Amino acid sequence: PRRAQERGTMGYALVEFTITDSGSVEDAVTIEGYCSSKRPDDPEVEFRPCSMFNSASARAAIKLKYKPKIVDGKAVPVEGVLHRFTYILDES
């Protein structure tokens, strides 16, 4: 998100959703988000709860496509799938 980029904020958001029997995503909800002014690979990084990445992550999740789960030869939905979206600023 632009606001995070302008502030030099990095972090992540964890999104939960359902993969439908056609492989699309629905019901995407961000369940937690954390921010830091340091890179996630920095040993001194300290994350704090924040919502800066929540809406962008939920919108991105809806665009994901998966190969449907097959049970007994039939595609079935999968609920409670978790995906972590990580946001790291480019150092260039």
Located regions from the model:
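Charge-biased low-complexity segments
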Residues: 1-92
